[in-house]
Amino acid sequence: MDKTDFYNKIKEFEGFKTHAYKCPAGVWTIGYGRTAGVTSGSVTNREAEESWFQNYVNSLMKEVSQRMTEYGYDLTEYQLQALTSFAYNLGMGNKNKGLIQLVKSGERTIEEISEKIPEYNKGGGVVLAGLVRRRAWEKDLFDGKFEKATISGKSNPTAKDLQLLVNEVSGSDLVIDGKIGKKTITATYNYIMEVFHG
């Protein structure tokens, strides 16, 4: 996912507040979900928070990458972004909370991590719709569902390239004739629906 899109998605989930408030977990929060140095009377503005936000996300991504490498994971860009969003929301944590708990200090497989992400949907012990949506997005990102599609590495793929790709990824048996007819459209549509709606 493009870095700007990634930043914007986290901001969308966090929202923006100029005055300090208590999050569902009871922690004083401000801006785009910042908790460091925030007290009941804290006030901020977008300019200050934009600078903090980008610096913090970049620093956090490096920390997540380093820790996951230490645990022996070889993450894709999308997996790293998903885990960075997760850590931004829940912290790096330890064996009892946050990202470290999610990966079980490196003991979980990539598949197990993917399965566990949606379970972290509570704030103050209550399931929150915003966290359900965020975890679903993080899981999809972690699973690579937002990867940019390339067909045979070509910038201008042909109809035959599309048919070959659809056959490969979906197990379809399209005739490779270069004609985008009803069968090609249906097979492509069905595959897209399966990927994004399971």
Language-model features and meaning:
Residues 176:
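Regulatory/sensor and coupling segments of signal-transduction and defense proteins
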Residues 1-19, 25-27, 34, 38, ...:
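Long, amphipathic alpha-helical surface segments
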Residues 194-198:
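Intrinsically disordered, low-complexity Ser/Thr-rich linker and spacer segments
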Residues 55, 59-96:
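Active-site nucleophile-His-acid catalytic modules used for acyl/amide transfer and hydrolysis
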Residues 29-31, 82-87, 112-113:
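Structural recognition of the beta-strand scaffold that forms the well-ordered cores
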Residues 173:
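Catalytic phosphate/metal-binding cores of nucleic-acid and nucleotide-processing enzymes, i.e., regions
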